[in-house]
Amino acid sequence: MRLLAQLLGLLMLWVPGSSGDIVMTQTPLSSPVTLGQPASISCRSSQSLVHSDGNTYLSWLQQRPGQPPRLLIYKISNRFSGVPDRFSGSGAGTDFTLKISRVEAEDVGVYYCMQATQFP
């Protein structure tokens, strides 16, 4: 019973939405696109994502229908291995953008921005 109380105590140390949490907001939530045309998604963090080591740990992930998420971009603008160069990332501090220069049919899916500067 004592162990259970200790575990519960540890779980209660992190309260989502508390002042130290970083909240990520993406816009638009959905967007119709035209094949061959550019598209972009914006992501804003509630506080700077610059880590104490000087890096900014902002990543973009793509989840195609029926598949797990895959990493597209890491540390703002670095394309992961095998990611086409039509994908690019930019931004700094709290504001970031994922751009697709020419949308292709295989780009359909859900896109996520993710920070790894701060963990609960």
From Swiss-Prot:
Residues 114-120 are annotated as: Complementarity-determining-3. Disulfide bonds join 43-113. Residues 75-81 are annotated as: Complementarity-determining-2. Residues 1-19 form the signal peptide. Residues 21-43 are annotated as: Framework-1. Residues 60-74 are annotated as: Framework-2. Keywords: Adaptive immunity, Cell membrane, Disulfide bond, Immunity, Immunoglobulin, Immunoglobulin domain, Membrane, Secreted, Signal. Residues 82-113 are annotated as: Framework-3. One of its GO terms (biological process) is immune response. It holds the Pfam family V-set. GO terms for cellular component: extracellular region; immunoglobulin complex; plasma membrane. SMART domains: IGv. Coiled coil: none annotated. InterPro entries: Ig-like_dom, Ig-like_dom_sf, Ig-like_fold, Ig_V-set, IgV_Light_Chain. SUPFAM superfamilies: Immunoglobulin. It is found in: Secreted; Cell membrane. Residues 44-59 are annotated as: Complementarity-determining-1. Residues 20-120 form the Ig-like domain. Its main location: secreted. Immunoglobulins are composed of two identical heavy chains and two identical light chains; disulfide-linked. V region of the variable domain of immunoglobulin light chains that participates in the antigen recognition. Immunoglobulins, also known as antibodies, are membrane-bound or secreted glycoproteins produced by B lymphocytes. In the recognition phase of humoral immunity, the membrane-bound immunoglobulins serve as receptors which, upon binding of a specific antigen, trigger the clonal expansion and differentiation of B lymphocytes into immunoglobulins-secreting plasma cells. This is Immunoglobulin kappa variable 2-24. It comes from Homo sapiens (Human). The gene is IGKV2-24.
